[in-house]
Amino acid sequence: NSFSNARMNNVITPELQSESITSADASYILRAPKFKARLTGFYSKIQDATEISFFYGEGIGSDDGGDEDTFVSEIVTGIDKQNMGAELGLEYQITSTIKATAAASYGQYIYSDNAKLKTNDDALAAEGNSPLTDFGTVYIKDYHQPGMPQTAASFGLEYRDPHFWWVGANVNYLANSYIDFANIL
């Protein structure tokens, strides 16, 4: 993410900083002849991340507010994220051939601070003008991160035949997934 659009120009991402990640997790593991369990708590803080996305926009960066289309790079810098939660995994050998498994995860994946937004307009760069437009602060603090469920669970049964074949089935539950938002609106 060092260049806003490396295919088109040599514009370096403004206010670029090294991303830092701080993580910790702790687990408790139980192993018995027929039963296995694992409980894990986790925490992760990501600071100064950069995300670049591309789209066509009307009137972005133009002084006259025209409706011409232009291809822009949306550059969001200074993104801070916080991920924390717990996971549980269980396995029970019901018989010598049948095993039950269960897993669950509950987490909170949020943006922990606001970020900065700029766009890189390829049409302005082609004309030799400054391609960057500063849109200021993006108010994303406490918004949930997109693309992952905050809650997940799974239950499964497995049959292992003594003649070296097996079959299994799982039922999954996913909840509290959030879609991505438009930073520029």
Regions found by a protein language model. Name each.
Residues 1-23, 43-74, 172-184:
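Surface-exposed extracellular loop regions of Gram-negative outer-membrane beta-barrel proteins
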